[in-house]
């Protein structure tokens, strides 16, 4: 058992989309990374022989949750608007935990659609969902 104290700092998580650093992260979970493919699957045959297969689907889904006041909403909306017009709106995305060793980078990503919008007395959140091509991804500790 290690006696070393480990530290995570949310203000050391860098989100860069299309070369632009994002800011105005929501309180709580502000980035989620989900593998869309199955990775591996397995089955057992009638005689008990086990076989496994690898999914060729290398896509990931990334969700950035921002406060409604964040100017980064304008950046993501602009990328989506450009893609809607040109159909060529692919951009790189980088997520890096500078207080740890987790890094996610994809050369090609796109915004799926505009997030749902709610307005109230309080500051609301905007959850932007992106899909990426095959990334370089290291999920590690701090």
Residue spans for each PLM region:
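Short, acidic/charged, Gly/Pro-enriched secondary-structure junctions
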Residues: 76-105
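Short, conserved turn/kink motifs that form compact alpha/beta structural patches or helix kinks used as
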Residues: 58-60, 64-84
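Short, structured patches in soluble enzyme cores that scaffold and shape functional sites
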Residues: 130-134
